[in-house]
From Swiss-Prot:
It comes from Mycolicibacterium smegmatis (strain ATCC 700084 / mc(2)155). GO terms for molecular function: 1,4-dihydroxy-2-naphthoyl-CoA synthase activity. Keywords: Lyase, Menaquinone biosynthesis. It catalyses: 2-succinylbenzoyl-CoA + H(+) = 1,4-dihydroxy-2-naphthoyl-CoA + H2O. Its EC number is 4.1.3.36. The gene is menB. Transmembrane segments: none annotated. This is 1,4-dihydroxy-2-naphthoyl-CoA synthase. GO terms for biological process: menaquinone biosynthetic process. Converts o-succinylbenzoyl-CoA (OSB-CoA) to 1,4-dihydroxy-2-naphthoyl-CoA (DHNA-CoA). It comes from the Bacteria. The record marks 110, 180, 282 as: Important for catalysis. The keyword Lyase applies.
Length: 309
């Protein structure tokens, strides 16, 4: 890596520490933000295959799901920054994620393989790529997921950025391209429907039908990017967003996320929102009275609880 490339790298190792218990990761890196020696409620999850534009294989997706689920279950984490490591050791190019690795895609889907070519495919394992489960995890977790697009966001990588709550993009290197129709694939779920919500139907259809590459500023104008940031400052900007979000009420943030989701997520969204509302109700004195009355085999006394209008 050249000194210029190193100086432009938005990742500053001094601001992060590896999350313990994940030393076996090969395709993903997982860090916790550290400020003045104190662990902060922000984590960084990054694709770590820069030599192939951070394309994912089944093993990559499994690791991604594992770390995201760990962040979801960590009560001291409020924001997840999702990005890609780089630059490429081959040509110095940058990528967030370029989608599925076409070299191990078979007729039954993306194959588990010991290597990176077709002859290393394990025929005994189903060609199942769990990227849709990852999308659902991002959508339904009660944490804010911010996508930091530092280079190419293509194909399945484009759909991941769409699924995240917020997107910040590198002014110099971010490129957005929906390649599905170029490789005989299509995202008929979150990657297309939510994109149409963000950009409108006409732009979303243009992005998918034409498969053109767009820079960060164009995507910002379309409505799919929140802010365009100088490349070297991308992760600093992400941390600033995270700090502001983590400075808000955790319960309010999770309810707001599920409220925004509800209009598009049907009965599933209603169930998620209702579950959170029920959990809030359990915290009230009124709910405690109902529980205690049941356990004590008496009629509940609701007289001290006003019927608000």
């Amino acid at each position: 890596m050249s000194s210029q490339a190193a100086s432009d790298n938005p990742f500053d190792p001094a601001m992060w520490e590896r999350v313990p218990g994940f030393d076996d990761l090969t395709d993903i890196t997982y860090h916790r933000h550290v400020l003045d020696g104190a662990r902060q409620p922000t984590v960084r999850v990054a694709f770590d295959r820069p030599e192939v534009r951070n394309a994912f294989r089944p093993h990559t997706v499994d690791e991604l799901y594992r770390v995201l689920d760990h962040a979801r279950m960590s009560s001291d984490v409020g924001v997840i920054l999702l990005t890609g490591n780089g630059p490429s050791p081959k040509d110095g190019g940058w990528a967030f994620c370029s989608g599925g690795d076409q070299r191990i895609r078979g007729r039954t889907g993306y194959q588990y393989a010991s290597g990176e070519t077709a002859e290393t495919v394990d025929p005994a394992r189903a060609g199942r790529l769990h990227i849709l489960e990852v999308q659902r995890l991002i959508r339904f977790m009660p944490k804010v997921v911010i996508c930091l697009v530092n280079g190419w966001a293509a194909g399945g990588g484009h759909s991941l950025h769409v699924t995240c709550d917020l997107t910040l993009a590198s002014r110099e290197h971010a490129r957005f391209k929906q390649t599905d129709a170029d490789v005989g694939s299509f995202d008929g779920g979150f990657g297309s429907a939510y994109l149409a919500r963000q950009t409108g139907q006409k732009f979303a259809r243009e992005i998918f039908f034409l498969g053109r590459a767009y820079d960060a500023q164009t995507m910002h104008q379309m409505g799919a990017v929140n802010e365009v940031v100088d490349h070297a400052d991308l992760e600093k900007a992400g941390l600033q967003y995270a700090a502001e979000i983590n400075g808000k009420s955790p319960q309010a943030i999770r309810m707001l996320k599920f409220a925004f989701n509800l209009i598009d997520d049907g009965l599933v969204g209603q169930q998620v929102f209702a579950g959170e509302a029920t959990r809030l109700a359990y915290m009230t004195d009124e709910a405690v009275e109902g529980r205690d009355a049941f356990l004590e085999k008496r009629d509940p006394d609701w007289s001290r609880f006003p019927r608000y209008f």
